[in-house]
Amino acid sequence: MNKLIQSKLELLPTSPGCYIHKDKNGTIIYVGKAKNLRNRVRSYFRGSHDTKTEALVSEIVDFEFIVTESNIEALLLEINLIKENKPKYNIMLKDDKSYPFIKITNETYPRLIITRQVKKDGGLYFGPYPDVGAANEIKRLLDRLFPFRKCTNPPEKVCFYYHLGQCKAHTICQVDSQYFKDLAQEVAAFLKGQDDQIIEDLRGKMAGAAQTMEFEKAAEYRDLIQSIGTLRTKQRVMAKDLQNRDVFGYYVDKGWMCVQVFFVRQGKLIERDVNLFPYYNDPDEDFLTYIGQFYQEKSHLKPNEILIPADIDEEAVRAMVDTKVLKPQRGEKKQLVNLAIKNARVSLQQKFDLLEKSIEKTQGAIENLGQLLNIPTPVRIESFDNSNIMGTSPVSAMVVFVNGKPSKKDYRKYKIKTVVGPDDYASMREVIKRRYSRVIRDGLTPPDLIVIDGGQGQVNVAKEVIQEQLGLDIPIAGLQKNDKHQTHELLFGDPLQVVELSRNSQEFFLLQRIQDEVHRFAITFHRQLRSKNSFSSQLDGIEGLGPKRKQNLMKHFKSLTKIKEASVDEIVEVGVPRAVAEAVQEKLNLKTQEQQQARLREVAEPQAEIE
């Protein structure tokens, strides 16, 4: 589990919603739902799992989540996201089964059934649902509300369901087939969220039963009303009109704005776009600017309708986008906007929480490091590393970390001037003396800790210069690497000793970042210098081609290869006389031929045996 996931897990809300797992390429590999996002997402990274889930977890590099108002919203949002993104592990973990539907069969006396196959058989299909459990839960409620046929084979006498009021016993009692057609339409309306009339009828029956003192029956009606309230399928993540619309919501805090856009297609929320950025003007104005820029991108097609918060100028949006723009005040559309705003608030808060945790961890790391080494908190740390290959172009580099963060304006590069050949100790001695002589001379701020990328020899050389030659009192530590070139151990003290440091501690991670950064900075400088020297050496000795013209050539063509490929006329255009341009081409092409011939000789000649 990487540090980003570790931090985000601590900040998950306990709300229901959907979570979205991504791999190293940012591809969605799994979408899931949860009644409690915190508990569910954390469970992936704790304990043991079956083989398939272990494979999923091994690929997770990041995750996102969308908060919903209820678990049923999460169910429906999950299926929409899965259908849209087709994550590979959703297919694997569900054993390649298709999703369940609730079906009203096309029979004279229809039945309510659950099926995974949608056929053109005249039946009415509702769904799909994310799993059989969700479909069964809704079907059980429908069975109690609508008296469809329950039996596959007609019984000879009325069945148990008839006495429960859940069947009309059509084979025994005369029931008009039109009754079931009307019943099917009622179910369709109910599943589309048109349940107000049903609830009103149930309330009337409940009141009637209570008046006649049939309290058990009244309790049954009460339970039915509560079940509808729990399982009603009129969801904020679903729209009844099957319209294509974009829903905008935003939230601002501490100079930052988060904009969330929900993409509703055919009435279903299939995707969302999240963007966080600092705002500098009036939030409403910056939000308007964002919408205008949003639809300038070719990937964002204008929908039939845009929903925006109530405090935004709809005429301004309409002028920019030229489509229907609404500021809903109530109902389903208002709930969609509220959901977008809620998710914007959650995303922005998560950013601040992650930032705060990062600051806390970094501050804690430098404080703990000071305690570990028994020195004042090392607010400013300067670190050094040397780089050379077989003594060629030896360089050194210094990086600076202030309050645990890189201070790149303070980085310094050093060309080694007094050392001949690959002498790491002498190079370190030169650079430390140059750096801290200048600190003394110019009155610069000295560091609280010097970290040397190296072992005992390099650290002792640095201590000799700092303490004995310059008379400074600056703590010096060393970072040794293992045979895999990874940060291995911390050296400190007089005499130097290995400091016990947990590899999972924030102090270790801080030192590791410092060592990786100084190594990167040094080796990048060394490569740049070698490339420049190689370029200069191949162009040396050409009459009329001085340092300025060499620099202009490199600036224009970027590399020797590009210069070799250029024509004489193209070189002349850079400001090089034609005779000199011809000499450049001749020398570079001759050099290339010599290199090719040398490689051919190497292949042809037998290699010396290694003893």
From Swiss-Prot:
Domain named UVR: residues: 196-231
SMART domains: GIYc
Pfam families per UniProt: GIY-YIG, HHH_5, UVR, UvrC_RNaseH, UvrC_RNaseH_dom
Residues in GIY-YIG domain copies: 14-91
GO biological process: nucleotide-excision repair; SOS response
Domain of life, source organism: Bacteria
Alphabetical list of PROSITE patterns matching this protein: GIY_YIG (PS50164), UVR (PS50151), UVRC (PS50165)
UniProt entry tagged with the keyword DNA repair: yes
Location in the cell: Cytoplasm
Protein purpose: The UvrABC repair system catalyzes the recognition and processing of DNA lesions. UvrC both incises the 5' and 3' sides of the lesion. The N-terminal half is responsible for the 3' incision and the C-terminal half is responsible for the 5' incision.
Subunit field text: Interacts with UvrB in an incision complex.
Protein name: UvrABC system protein C
Species this protein is from: Streptococcus gordonii (strain Challis / ATCC 35105 / BCRC 15272 / CH1 / DL1 / V288)
Gene designation: uvrC
